[in-house]
Amino acid sequence: MSNIALIFGISGQDGAYLAQLLLSKGYEVHGTSRDAEMAEFSSLKRLGIKNKISFHSVALNDFRSTLKVLEEVVPKEVYNLAGQSSVGLSFEQPIETLESIANATINILEAIRFISCNCKFYNASSSECFGDTGENPANEDT
């Protein structure tokens, strides 16, 4: 059985580089977008890997949409890189930010539980959650 990865938020820089790494390790890679048919996936094109990935349209704020893609893909690994990534915009649009990050993560976790997916889950966050750590890098003691 091959390693299958599902990347929520594949169209961003981190998603593209993660997809490239997983492909180099022999993974079958699936990625999501709100509208996979219309999305440009410019980062994936630039890396020359867009045609090696299977794309799925998913509305992460909709549980059924999230559940459907997990049932179709049956991944061994799930990566959540989706959501609002601009700190400034997160303060301007707090409700949308909450929905795009917290509710989406809950939907992914609940869908994994619902289908009894025996998979690894990785949830990306922002270094902004640590605040100002001074001149030192953030670590477990910060």
PLM region descriptions:
Residues 1-142:
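N-terminal Rossmann-like NAD(P)+-binding domain of SDR-like oxidoreductases, especially those catalyzing
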